Amino acid sequence: MKAYIYDDKPGDQRLPHDTGIDIPEPTLAKLGVVYQRIPIDSEGAWESKIDEFAKERGYKNRDRITVTREGLGEAYEEKIKSFFDEHLHEDEEIRYILAGSGYFDIRGAEGVHEEQWIRIALEAGDLIVLPAGIYHRFTVDSANTITAMRLFQDEPKWTPYSRKADGTDKLGSRDKYLETVRVGVTA
């Protein structure tokens, strides 16, 4: 995992857009992001570590998603664009990268890189939890392939609320997230 300030220059979203300004893990933690490195080993020890993590956090369900040009065919470009629309969820977004690589961009919040995009580069063995209410977006990198395990507390659901839509800033999950960040920054 590598996190840094996104350069916000026009161009292919799948390129690094690295400003050279690194963001350390404690800063991500202030924004509510949980990160763990759980290397994928041939013996399968990673699976028991994921099971343990899921049990600790109350994740009862999981599935796998693969994003490739071959797998999605003509829908690939449209799907990538939809993932890259700035949005939030009312539940945590949990991903364990099994193969390939990509980027999660998260929006800074009050007192922590406010309104700047922070790009988090992920590869196989990286586990990330984005808190409910955080604005974010996702894209594969220039390799155009990623396979991830998605974990869910209840029934699998993935409802994005676009920042462009009326009312998104007023969702309870957004208010709760901002309050959590305020407390974390001032604590």
UniProtKB/Swiss-Prot annotation:
Pfam families named among the record's database cross-references: ARD
Catalyses which reaction(s): 1,2-dihydroxy-5-(methylsulfanyl)pent-1-en-3-one + O2 = 4-methylsulfanyl-2-oxobutanoate + formate + 2 H(+); 1,2-dihydroxy-5-(methylsulfanyl)pent-1-en-3-one + O2 = 3-(methylsulfanyl)propanoate + CO + formate + 2 H(+)
Residues reported to bind Fe(2+): 87, 89, 93, 136
Main location: cytoplasm
InterPro entries recorded: ARD, ARD_euk, RmlC-like_jellyroll, RmlC_Cupin_sf
Annotated residues for binding of Ni(2+): 87, 89, 93, 136
Taxonomy, superkingdom: Eukaryota
CDD domains: cupin_ARD (cd02232)
Keywords: Amino-acid biosynthesis, Cytoplasm, Dioxygenase, Iron, Metal-binding, Methionine biosynthesis, Nickel, Nucleus, Oxidoreductase
GO biological process: L-methionine salvage from methylthioadenosine; methionine metabolic process
Gene3D superfamilies listed in its UniProt record: Jelly Rolls
Record-level GO cellular component terms: cytoplasm; nucleus
Cofactor: binding comment: Binds either 1 Fe or Ni cation per monomer. Iron-binding promotes an acireductone dioxygenase reaction producing 2-keto-4-methylthiobutyrate, while nickel-binding promotes an acireductone dioxygenase reaction producing 3-(methylsulfanyl)propanoate.
Compartment list: Cytoplasm; Nucleus
Documented EC number(s): 1.13.11.54, 1.13.11.53
Annotated GO MF terms: acireductone dioxygenase (Ni2+-requiring) activity; acireductone dioxygenase [iron(II)-requiring] activity; iron ion binding; nickel cation binding
UniProt cofactor(s): Fe(2+); Ni(2+)
Signal peptide residues on this chain, from the entry's feature table: none
Pathway listed: Amino-acid biosynthesis; L-methionine biosynthesis via salvage pathway; L-methionine from S-methyl-5-thio-alpha-D-ribose 1-phosphate: step 5/6
Summary of the function given for this chain in its UniProt record: Catalyzes 2 different reactions between oxygen and the acireductone 1,2-dihydroxy-3-keto-5-methylthiopentene (DHK-MTPene) depending upon the metal bound in the active site. Fe-containing acireductone dioxygenase (Fe-ARD) produces formate and 2-keto-4-methylthiobutyrate (KMTB), the alpha-ketoacid precursor of methionine in the methionine recycle pathway. Ni-containing acireductone dioxygenase (Ni-ARD) produces methylthiopropionate, carbon monoxide and formate, and does not lie on the methionine recycle pathway.
Cited PANTHER family: ACIREDUCTONE DIOXYGENASE
UniProt family annotation: Belongs to the acireductone dioxygenase (ARD) family.
Name this protein carries in UniProt: Acireductone dioxygenase
Record gene name: ADI1
